[in-house]
Amino acid sequence: MKIAVTGKGGVGKSTIVGMLARALSDEGWRVMAIDADPDANLASAIGVPAERLSALLPISKMTGLARERTGASETTGTHFILNPRVDDIPEQFCVDHAGIKLLLMGTVNHAGSGCVCPEHALVRTLLRHILTKRKECVLIDMEAGIEHFGRGTIEAVDLLVIVIEPGSRSLQTAAQIEGLARDLGIKTICHIANKLASPVDVGFILDRADQFDLLGSIPFDSAIQAADQAGLSCYDLSPACRDKAHALMAALLERVGPTQGVS
């Protein structure tokens, strides 16, 4: 089961991926969580202690590894391997916590839309390998878009979850992401409404329910905010968050069905 989570910046993607990863792990799933957001907040959302991550770099920042695997060098210029070996990277660089394998993937910024560099080749090949070859349940915390995916990879995504909040800009971003995702061939797309702080917020979402397929919602919870401020996982601090995580997990499994990844 391969699930990508995206949405406008600041809507709470990392928190939701962390909650789902912990719930799935507690239910016996073998889970790999990939942080492909440049802000890289997924570790604390899962509950990984900060001191365990201080020496780690995202794969996208490992220039030496990218050059080693692609054969790139200052003398080769733009000539390097576009499909490098990556099958051993998860075992080398994943951090294990609460039964979850966390991989800091990161992103690669380009000056031009057609730019391909060794780091980009490594990250894209690694993501394709994980989505098409690995047997775990994979959760990907993404930036606001699906730029990581190409047409050779996109069909491996079982479900795209777009996180929204009660605001017009959030819904505009969600609509843009959904349009691109459908153009690329993702068939199953749903939404989670986050940060619903009042009946007005709930009404805002329900009044527009015909615009999206709502998987579930998360009310505003001060425990989530407190966990974020402390760099901890709300799953560890709040029974209400754990209950909500398991409810979302159950709704998610109804959409895609248990396929692979159960221990």
From Swiss-Prot:
Keywords: ATP-binding, Nickel, Nucleotide-binding. GO terms for molecular function: ATP binding; ATP hydrolysis activity; GTPase activity. It comes from the Bacteria. GO terms for biological process: negative regulation of cell division; nickel incorporation into metallo-sulfur cluster. ATP binds at residues 7-14. InterPro entries: CobQ/CobB/MinD/ParA_Nub-bd_dom, CooC, P-loop_NTPase, ParA/MinD_ATPase. Gene3D superfamilies: P-loop containing nucleotide triphosphate hydrolases (3.40.50.300). GO terms for cellular component: cytoplasmic side of plasma membrane; cytosol; membrane. It holds the Pfam family CbiA. PANTHER family: SEPTUM SITE-DETERMINING PROTEIN MIND HOMOLOG, CHLOROPLASTIC, SEPTUM SITE-DETERMINING PROTEIN MIND HOMOLOG, CHLOROPLASTIC-RELATED. Involved in the insertion of nickel into the carbon monoxide dehydrogenase (CODH). This is Carbon monoxide dehydrogenase accessory protein CooC.
